[in-house]
């Protein structure tokens, strides 16, 4: 019983839950090449590498981008085996207005629409951003960038919106 309550507390402390499954591998370069005429895929790999590098460098995130990196910096990012792994769902945990723990499940096929707090400030800033989740993925990333502290492989979870 005590172990069960410890596991429950650990689950509540986690912001989200995403499968570790590697049952649906996607070769990222083949995936983009096969869909090159779809505007959604325009600049996908450079943007994804920018995102990974920004996270690895612990840069501030404004909710839209970490900023642009030059090609030389992007080339320091390696996606292990050129594989990303598709997941069917992700569960997002949160605290409700009445201080209860709750969560929502996002599924790109059935419940793809999300709303997040906007980082924008100012008189005409919108309080929320809205997006549609196209895919849920995880992968392993390695970077040899000089400023990345740990030169080991890092698991990266990401939503494609």
Model-derived features: where do they sit?
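Terminal interaction-prone segments of large eukaryotic proteins
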Residues: 1-161
């Amino acid at each position: 019983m005590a172990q069960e309550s410890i596991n429950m507390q650990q689950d509540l402390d986690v912001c989200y839950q995403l499968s570790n499954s590697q049952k649906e591998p996607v070769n990222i370069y083949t995936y983009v090449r096969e869909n090159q005429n779809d505007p959604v895929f325009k600049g996908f790999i450079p943007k994804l590498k920018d995102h990974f590098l920004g996270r690895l460098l612990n840069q501030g995130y404004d909710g839209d981008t970490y900023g642009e990196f030059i090609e030389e910096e992007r080339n320091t990012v390696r996606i292990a085996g050129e594989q990303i792994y598709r997941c069917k769902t992700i569960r997002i945990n949160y605290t409700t207005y009445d201080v209860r723990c709750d969560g929502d499940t996002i599924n790109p096929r059935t419940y793809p629409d999300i709303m997040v707090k906007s980082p924008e400030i100012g008189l005409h800033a919108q309080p929320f951003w809205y997006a549609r989740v196209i895919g849920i993925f995880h992968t392993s990333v390695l970077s040899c960038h000089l400023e990345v502290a740990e030169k080991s492989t890092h698991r990266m979870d990401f939503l494609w919106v």
